[in-house]
C-alpha cells in the first residue's frame, strides 16, 4: 500500500501538512481559530455544497513550489485544493477583508432586521459574519425584496425573506430523503425556496434542514417564540432509536425541554457518530421526544466561551468552571484577531456614532466612521 502524499501549505503564516486533495478551507480549519475562513454555503457533510456565497474567498500569494506565481484573483477556499508549497492569506490580506465586507453587504441587501424576534438569534452564522466582517451602515435606499411566510408542513416554517440561497436545505433533502419536494424556483432576484403547489415536507429526516440552515429562514415551529437560546442549557443525550443515530442536544430550561437538535461541532456542522457517520436525527427524536425521561442524559454540552449561549452557564450551572487562562495560552500564542480592536475591524458599535441623532435612515455618509477618521 502506497504512502499518502502530503502537501505543505501555509495559511496566514502558519504551516500545516495535509493530504493531497484537501481544500484550502479544510486545511485552515485544521489550524482553527480566526485562520479558518467563514463559510455560509459549504457544509462538509453535504456533497456538492460550497462555491455559492463567496464568503470564504482567500488570496493565494504563492501557487506552489513548482509554480510560485500568485493567483490573479481571490479564490473560493471551499472549492480550491491545496498544492505543495502553497501560501494563502486570509485575515492577513487587505484584499480579503475588503472583499468579505462587500460580500456581507450583498448578503444583507434584502435581509430583514429580525434579530430581536428571530429564533436563530444567538447561533446565526450570518449574525456572526456581519458582526465580524460587516459595516455599521447600509448604502441601500430602495425597497427590499420580501416574501410571505410559508408553513412547510406541521413542523417547519419558511421565512424566505431571510434566506441567502445557500442551497444547504436542497442538498440535505437530496441526500437524506427518497424524493426531494422543495427546491429553487425562478431566477435572479426572483429566486426562492419553495415547493410545488405548497406541498408539505413530511419525510422522516426532513427536520435536518433546520439544523443546516445558517440563518433563520427555516425554523422549528415547535420552538417558535418560546425562548432564547442563551437562556437554555444544552445537554448531550441519547436514546436507542431504530431510525437514526439517537445522539442529540437537549435545550432545557429547568426540567422543560424546549427543543431537540443534532449535535454540532465548532463549525456549526453535524457531528460524526463514533462509527464515523454524520449524526443526522429523525423527526421523532427532534419533534416528539420533548421530555427528559425519553433520553439518557450524558452531561452538559461543551460551549465556546465566547458564544452568547455561554452567558450565565459558568460556575457550576452546567458543571463548568470559569476559565482563567488567557486567550493566547489556548491559541498557540496568537492574539485574538477581532478582539484586538473590534470597532476598527468591523465599524460595528462605534462609540462615536449616535444613530438616534440622525434624521431619517442612517447611511455611511451621515456620520464619520473609523475608516474616515484613520
Predicted ranges, named:
Residues 43-44, 116-126:
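Short, glycine/charge-rich beta-strand/loop segments that flank catalytic centers
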Residues 7-9, 13-84, 94:
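N-terminal cofactor/phosphate-binding cores enriched in small/glycine residues
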Residues 2-21, 60, 67, 85-111, ...:
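N-terminal export/assembly segments and adjacent metallocofactor-ligating motifs
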